[in-house]
Amino acid sequence: MPKERIVAPSKEFAKLANVSLKEYKSKYKESIEKPEKFWAEQAKRLTWFKKWTKVLRHDFAKAKVEWFVGGKLNVSYNCLDRHLDSPLKNKAALIWEGDNPDESKVLTYHDLHREVNHFANVLKKFKVKKGDRVLIYLPMVPELAIATLACTRIGAVHSVVFGGFSPEALLGRIEDCKPTLVITADGGYRGGKPIELKKNVDAALAETKFKVNDVIVVKRTGDEGNLNWKEGRDHWYHYLMKDPEVKKECPAVPMESEDPLFILYTSGSTGKPKGVLHTTAGYLLGANLTFATIFDYKDTDTYWCTADIGWITGHSYILYGPLSNGATSLMFEGVPSYPDMGRFWDVIDKYKVTVFYTAPTAIRALMREGLEHIKKRSLASLRLLGSVGEPINPEAWEWYYANIGKSKCPIVDTWWQTETGSIMISGIPGAIPQKPGSASWPFYGIQPVLVDNEGVELKGKGEISGNLCIAKPWPSMMRGVYGDPKRFFDTYFSQFKGYYFTGDGANRDKEGYFRITGRVDDVLNVSGHRIGSAEVESALVEHKSVAEAAVVGFPHDIKGQGIYAYVTVKQGVVTNDLLKKELIAMVEKVIGKIARPDVIHWAPGLPKTRSGKIMRRILRKIANNEFDTLGDISTLADPSVVQSLIDDKKKYHS
């Protein structure tokens, strides 16, 4: 494969595209030079109850940002009500495809509006009011979308927790955000197997110091025999929705632009997950504009983002981006491998999906299966592909382009974060020529800069690598870490003064294309999901046999990054496969299966400085078989540990 292949948009695609290269350059220039004028114009895309008095007020050095000051609007109104006086009323808003291929459901905008209004009044019955937190721990079922939108309708702050997280992970989130109530399901399905949800909620609530008085339970599996039902606390969703005393109509509450919208927890470089706080107007505008522009949205599209709503990708590009544009968004409960490895392609053909947005991890897993399943399907409806969650390697990009897009669909390789709220760097289909493996150019209003380790901006027109920062505020950026302003400032604004620090490294070539090179902190990107090394280490040392643990990432064929755990056991403990299984089970219990280590390397000791700091740089190199580039290890407290780890790596983990 040529080192730097450039794929220009086809004339056919470019002719119908929403944005041309000339228009992109003009709009981008205005968005950087006259940001307030640009964003005031874009804000007309939303419906406001009251117009703002000031577009932007900020002190970036102090992490203070406010957009559309004085304005009032409602997210639910923008996603539902404003579409009802048009033909969109009877258009499919959500297409739900169950884990079982025989289960599906379509909700029009009228249907979704009705259900959201009704459930918003159920929430009000439980005294949920503006500013209260509601924790949602549901599978990918329509009730998840209904619950989030109902929260936004009455001004409650939702916090969706991915259904794969353990009771202990759930407990930490409950104690941090202190929800008025919890919404869960009796269970769920994943790959044909039932998964426990209410049981996990019960376990978390049994341990919490914060009392949750009410739990609303969606009936999904119907396995009532195994439910630990708590009268007075637990309430069936379907009974509540049939309650004749609950009104059907619920007015959308006018919200200030900067009112909190949702909290979404993400891993940090320290053990405790961060509650990323997003606010109303800026977030919605970011999701709305990026969806319409980057996915070249047409009103005839059937759009499918394969993410879970438990992650930011699902928030922005299953719910808020598509629905605020009046799009048809597909919501998928299942996995790409069930009932066989052709499931994604079946769903695309079944619903004539036109825009498909998935993760490199899924692409690599499907790539490994060969072309057998693809040849049995048409995929002719597709016109645009997307990639999200981690950098896509050029080999996977080429496979995706040739075999799924049939060499005619552009690929938007999108870089962004939970914290950024919406896509930051991406190709614009039909406008920007693509380079496999590159996230391309910045979106409107985004001013990325590369800085060295001292915070000095790296300028020049040649190829440059450095720490990726953002120089100016943008509407959809997070406004804080919930309940912890110091952590917000320390994490994102203290390391490089005057910049938002992404935690990623990047390379910029002479044409201005960005390639994301990965995390530069102690956060792992596993299958597109962020996992803090400290979280996994803390889980491992909970085991009575473990004295110490250090976790690093290593290249993984499918996941992008795998989890490599160095474990030192206590004196007298015998290391064996049974203990490895116990440690993996411990991590699954504390965090969830998503964080299970791929490799457990028994370590006689860990390389430390004389002050006791673990040298993770050395551990990463050993995990990556880079034994010849360790650098000077003579200053370590015990340099002999390094050779011992290398010998074991060659012997047991090669």
UniProtKB/Swiss-Prot annotation:
Residues bound to Mg(2+): V541, H543, V546
Residues that coordinate or bind ATP: G389, E390, P391, D413, T414, W415, W416, Q417, T418, D504, R519, R530
SUPFAM superfamilies named among the record's database cross-references: Acetyl-CoA synthetase-like
EC numbers: 6.2.1.1
Enzyme class: ligase
Cofactor: Mg(2+)
InterPro entries reported in the protein's UniProt record: Ac_CoA_lig, ACAS_N, AMP-bd_C, AMP-bd_C_sf, AMP-binding_CS, AMP-dep_synth/lig_dom, ANL_N_sf
Keyword Signal: no
Pfam family, any one: AMP-binding
Sequence positions that bind CoA: R190, G191, G192, K193, T313, S527
Catalytic activity: acetate + ATP + CoA = acetyl-CoA + AMP + diphosphate
Biological process according to GO: acetyl-CoA biosynthetic process from acetate
Modification after translation, per record: Acetylated. Deacetylation by the SIR2-homolog deacetylase activates the enzyme.
Molecular function per GO: acetate-CoA ligase activity; AMP binding; ATP binding; metal ion binding
Residues bearing PTM N6-acetyllysine: K613
Keyword NADP (UniProt): no
Record keywords: Acetylation, ATP-binding, Ligase, Magnesium, Metal-binding, Nucleotide-binding
Listed Gene3D superfamilies: 3.30.300.30, N-terminal domain of ligase-like
Cellular component per GO, a single term: cytosol
Family designation: Belongs to the ATP-dependent AMP-binding enzyme family.
Function: Catalyzes the conversion of acetate into acetyl-CoA (AcCoA), an essential intermediate at the junction of anabolic and catabolic pathways. AcsA undergoes a two-step reaction. In the first half reaction, AcsA combines acetate with ATP to form acetyl-adenylate (AcAMP) intermediate. In the second half reaction, it can then transfer the acetyl group from AcAMP to the sulfhydryl group of CoA, forming the product AcCoA.
PANTHER family linked: ACETYL-COENZYME A SYNTHETASE (PTHR24095), ACETYL-COENZYME A SYNTHETASE 1 (PTHR24095:SF14)
Protein name, per record: Acetyl-coenzyme A synthetase
Lineage: Bacteria, Pseudomonadati, Spirochaetota, Spirochaetia, Leptospirales
